[in-house]
Amino acid sequence: MLRCLALTVLLSCMSFAWCADRPYLVTNSAAAEEDEEQVWSVENWYRSAGAQRSLTVAPEYAFDPLNSLQVEFRRTLDREGVNGHELEVEYKHLFNHIARDGYGWGVVAALDMVRPQGGPWTRSAVSLALPFSLQVAEGSGLLHLNLGVSKPRDERRVFTGALAAEREVFRRTTLFAEWARDEDGRLLHGGVRYWIKRETLAVDLAWQRVRSDDSRGSGVVLGIAWYDL
């Protein structure tokens, strides 16, 4: 009984823990990176929102510009709830090249698992999303739209949606923002990405606000990412 209660609380803390492409928290990009051929990347970020804290490490392997596999390992801490771990496996396939067509679209499938502190690993949800990306501002910016559906364990399906935008404003500096919503809550997130070494090493500084039926709060998001490893 206690394990079931702990799992329920941890699942409620997972609002907007959908699969995503950095620097976003929810949104997937459908912009194919033409130089990503059999390369690794590692993205890491820390999130703070109200009583909740989390640290994520996410290695990704790009088979080619159109196909990639990412695994996210996340440690969650909640001063008012249950601590635990989360694991997400995500496969993304893109159907075209944005550099050629000016737009891109694809499909993302993900499996989520959780382990409350002291409990076993349990499947928490499966999801499917359709990302669409559009080049704007003569190629210096991107607009993203995601529509999807998630099936939490022992619950009804939840439809999800996200909008995001990014644009390079200075050399090596990109501003980004995203808005997401499902039937239980909303997310607002925005910040700046700075490339220490262009296309190889980046740091992110952002702010987020989360509002759901179970909790609400705001806080910082700090990230660092290595690409083309």
Task: Give, region by region, the residue ranges found by the protein language model.
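N-terminal signal peptide c-region/cleavage motif recognized by signal peptidases
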Residues: 12-15
